[in-house]
Amino acid sequence: EDIWKKFELLPTPPLSPSRAALPGDPGELGAVAGDCSLMGFGLTDPLDWASELLLLPGDDIWGASDGDLFGSVLDTTDNSIIIQDCMWSGFSA
């Protein structure tokens, strides 16, 4: 007996193509002249757009390396160091 039929679950959908619909790609499926694509990516489904963001390297999304994400500790005031420490600590009330 097939377990999927018993629970009436659908199989997992295929993964979205990685960066296949970014502007400038010759094989771009969603780039037709005058189409209403989401933010110029050629992706009409918001879930596809979100999937593409998850696949981008961190520098492409944030524009900074991991070490520069919160700035240098030397350039901050004592108050901001305390805020960062409280934000990222594992303590919960």
Swiss-Prot record:
Record bears the keyword DNA-binding: yes
Organism name: Danio rerio (Zebrafish)
Keywords: DNA-binding, Nucleus
Compartment annotation: Nucleus
Phylogenetic lineage: Eukaryota, Metazoa, Chordata, Craniata, Vertebrata
Protein name: N-myc protein
GO molecular function: DNA binding; DNA-binding transcription factor activity
One family name in Pfam for this protein: Myc_N
GO CC annotation terms, alphabetical: nucleus
Complexes and interactors: Efficient DNA binding requires dimerization with another bHLH protein. Binds DNA as a heterodimer with MAX.
Gene: mycn
PANTHER family: MYC PROTO-ONCOGENE (PTHR45851)
Top-level taxon in the UniProt lineage: Eukaryota
Predominant place of localization: nucleus
Function in brief: May function as a transcription factor.
Expression sites by tissue: Barely detectable in most tissues assayed.
